[in-house]
């Protein structure tokens, strides 16, 4: 969707961007009144560990670079998954303990917890990212209705976070997507205005198991099936297979490309084999996040 130029981090990171496997606490959580209870500097308090996500993600690469750029020689970036990261954050917040995690926006954890990004004076994490819609070559000619809708699909971080929160709070992804579509009929009708229904044609969309992409992909599936009468199959894969699947035509498209940072490597390698329809969401952010009750404001503070 070349509406403008992203996965953001480099987000492609994605990211970001995020498994939905970890439970979130009930309701909005106020920041604890007691700050850091451990003794010593922030490094000692968190055992010189930054809790990361999936190895190889753009956000992880950016964080490895940050450790080098800020000369955090004693620090370790812990690999895992977005689900493991949010589980660790949830427990630390509940216990009012210090913790440093790799973070990105949009993400439900910023709505559930009072968090803040650490300032990045060296600009290691780059500027805000965008999430792009990517489709296979030939989709416009073979599936014009799907192409037209995917080209028009565009929403806000606030829209996405509503669906993410509903899923995190226990709704099935398809139920949360259907509820959002019903509540936002006017916007959805703008997306499909003037597009002919496909009446049972099949379409395959790929996505990564990040909270953000689970939300967006299920909303797109709901609109394609409810409004345009497609039969949509979703394929959950890792970032690499997602990009490769679209580039070789095994998958029709995705709405999960974090650019220009998170998925930068994939875009550079496969950009001439796919069609970029441009951003479907702007305003994403990557960086290191901490609970607001921690007395720390910048990545440079980690050296103290």
Label each region the model flagged.
Residues 31-51, 136-138, 148, 154-157, ...:
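A conserved helix-loop-strand patch within extracytoplasmic ligand-binding domains
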Residues 13-17:
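C-terminal motif of bacterial Sec signal peptides marking the signal peptidase cleavage site
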Residues 86-93, 107-116, 217, 239-271:
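Pocket-flanking alpha-helical
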